[in-house]
């Protein structure tokens, strides 16, 4: 899923310093992060029995933790804060109520092909007010994760996911598939806390530096 880094801790420290140096005086961006699934909806299950809902929740919490360490953190809200099933409509309504600058839904992939691997970034295939912004941000996120952080990527794709379709009239929205739980290497990689920390930092770095 990525080019293995010999010293992830050093990279985390380095990018936290870069984030701190790059903070500006503009109004805080409001970000809604949607940890996919939850409760009785476990989502995909990995070869090592890891569940998609748990990966998404752990990753979202790690983004929150890293963000709170910043001198000037973003305003980040989650659609769920524990193992609870929240309806898709309620997730999008929260983003609208908060007047979010960006909606990011976190998921893991699964395939009958055990060799399928890599991240995917989705935007809605429905044309709306924020279609261009969402598409641009999706390509920026893909570029960031792939070239800057070394994650294997399957590119930006378009789909009619409900959380994307229902947010596109009031904010740019993207859905990130973090890798394939059906792939032995990626399932193992995602299950390690240090690696989730690496992914979370990559996401936070993108959120902090992107032009929303």
Cite the ranges covered by each PLM segment:
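Bacterial N-terminal signal peptides that target proteins for export
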Residues: 1-10
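Sec-exported extracytoplasmic/periplasmic mature domains
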Residues: 61-72, 96-100, 108, 142-151, ...
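A generic structural signal for alpha->beta connector loops
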Residues: 73, 118, 153, 170-172
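Catalytic-core regions of hydrolytic enzymes
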Residues: 24-32, 37-137
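Bacterial N-terminal signal peptides
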Residues: 9-19
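Conserved catalytic motifs of the protein kinase core domain
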Residues: 10, 28, 171
């Amino acid at each position: 899923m990525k080019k293995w880094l010999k010293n992830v801790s050093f990279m985390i420290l380095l990018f936290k310093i870069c984030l701190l140096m790059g903070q500006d005086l503009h109004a805080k961006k409001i970000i809604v992060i949607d940890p996919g699934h939850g409760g009785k909806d476990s989502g995909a299950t990995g070869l090592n029995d890891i569940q998609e809902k748990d990966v998404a929740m752990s990753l979202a919490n790690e983004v929150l933790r890293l963000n709170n360490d910043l001198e000037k953190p973003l305003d980040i809200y989650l659609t769920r804060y524990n193992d609870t099933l929240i309806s898709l409509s309620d997730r999008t309504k929260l983003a609208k109520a908060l007047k979010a600058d960006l909606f990011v839904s976190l998921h893991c992939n699964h395939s009958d092909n055990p060799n399928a691997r890599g991240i995917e970034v989705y935007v809605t295939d429905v044309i709306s007010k924020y279609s261009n912004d969402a598409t641009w941000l999706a390509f920026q996120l893909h570029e960031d994760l792939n070239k800057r952080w070394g994650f294997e990527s399957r590119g930006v794709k378009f789909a009619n996911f409900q959380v994307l379709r229902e947010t596109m009239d009031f904010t740019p929205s993207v859905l990130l598939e973090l890798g394939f739980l059906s792939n032995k290497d990626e399932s193992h990689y995602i299950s390690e806390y240090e690696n989730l920390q690496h992914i979370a930092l990559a996401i936070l770095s993108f959120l902090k530096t992107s032009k929303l």
